Amino acid sequence: MTTISTTTASSSSSSRGRVFHRRTHQSRRRLLRTTEVVQAQTSSSNDAMEEETFDVVIIGSGIGGLSAAALLAKYDLKVCCVESHEHAGGAAHEWKRDGFTFESGPSLYTGLSQFPTSNPLGQILHAIDEPLKCIRYNTWKVHFPEATFVTEVGNDQFIECLEKYYDAEAVADWRKLKEKMEPLAQASAALPPAAVRTDAYAAWTLARFIPGLFQSMPSLNAILSDYESFLDKNDINSKFIRDYMDLLCFLLSGGTSKATMGAEIGYMFADWYAPNAALEFPIGGSGALVDCLVRGFEKYGGDLRLRTHCEEILVEKKDGEEEEATGIVTKTRDGKKKILRARKAVISNATIWDTEALLRDCAEGRRQSVREASSTTRTTKSGKIVDDDVEFCQSFMHLHLGIDAANLPAAETLEMHHVWVGDWDKGVDAEQNLVLVSIPSIKDPSMAPEGKHVIHAYTPGNEPLARWKNVKYNSEEYSKLKKERSEVLYQAVAKALNNITVEDLRSRAEIEMVGTPVTHARFLRRGNSQGTYGGTGWIKKKESGDDSAAAVPVTSAKSNLKNLLLVGDSRFPGPGLPAVAAGGWAAAHELVDFRRQCEVLDKVVAR
């Protein structure tokens, strides 16, 4: 699951060896965007804005943007990726302070280091020849209303937990679910995102997967529908198993089973509950993952520009044809502006709502179409049009701690990952009812100084945006609300540390940082999207009497504006590392020859 940065990351000005581009720009007059005026600007060197030209310009270095960037550079395109922050990685970046390494986002990883893998992000790492060193493990601890216990992935130990803490119905339903999930998991992996393209040449890239697709036909409807319908159809009635699957869906997609596509949970189930499956943790944290993508991008000639903000997406009409994206205007922290032209495409890793705001001189209808292209539409038998609009996910509260571990239990007796649920009846998406705790220094001691632990606790996408909408950053109201809303995080961390008191935990804290939806909006440039975790709403359980076909969103980077592609957590399939990496594959394969795509498929997909 990918979470969102909530800190300034100001503790380290290091950028892992990146070069900040601080070229001298000439002053500019008001930017006019028609082709004729851009040509006229060159008549005055004092008035003209400096320009550079690339094949592709990418806005934002989140995992979706970096995935597309690294793949396109691998395909020999000239690519520039601009990032407002001083660190690459977007919601997955990390920063250091006083020897502690803090992760802003992801905490649970699978399928990144082994080969073959069904994880689209793991496949990208293989494609660009950037292996990621990971620690493999298989346990996590849950703190549920009924019981607290350690459970495992990759075997049947969960059955033992069900037998000990729950009832016979839960055991029977879990056994049944594992059996029913096997064909769903196989169907979910039958067509990797790396094979998809939207032109006629898809016949070539998809050909090798046709046999697997035919074998998966009986499960096709299930992978394209909401997962709750799958549970209903297979008579999974145990309240705990239904609650538990809601939890897994929410951690995966930001929605419960009624709002999660069967294919998504199929991928996850294959990764977690296949024999000998394991969780992974990148040595060095999420920053090591980001570094792999950046190294791959740069070694193939990519140009990453940090501290470089996109002010605007340029939209022009050429020769009287339809509007198209032709480049961007950037602004560095010293106030200098530059035009970066794109021969083939502009790719935005900003949210669809924040991308819309960058289309300043685009026709109103075109601006709206950026958002509408991310929705799904279906038609009922009676001819009624039903729009399933993309919606905001809620946001996060985050707690980052660097603590003194003196007299705490030894690291080998503690678990790295903890999940706390307050009340199943409220629902896992209820505010303040679900907390995740990650203590990465338990598995990777390099994440904290000797004798210390680094901790990240967060409410994963269930903090209401509306509660923070009109709260001013650093106001008295903000400080009070931040303290109030972070209390549940302290309580969950205290439980994770073998039930120490909150007072003991606070006394151990050497570094303490609390993040809110407001810090999401500020540091991830999500002002128009209010600090959201990403998008949701593409998968909706049909209401009684709705005779429409299921709305089937497709992993596509296309927008309704020519040469503007969209990636990231506000596009289907939504938040999460595998999901946004799938968007990176989709964007890259809108722009490259199918024969090059087939070469990469030979490399990353096991036959």
What label would you give each PLM region?
Residues 404-515:
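C-terminal segments that line or cap access tunnels to active or ligand-binding sites in enzymes
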Residues 145-260:
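Rossmann-like flavin
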Residues 1-27:
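N-terminal chloroplast transit peptides
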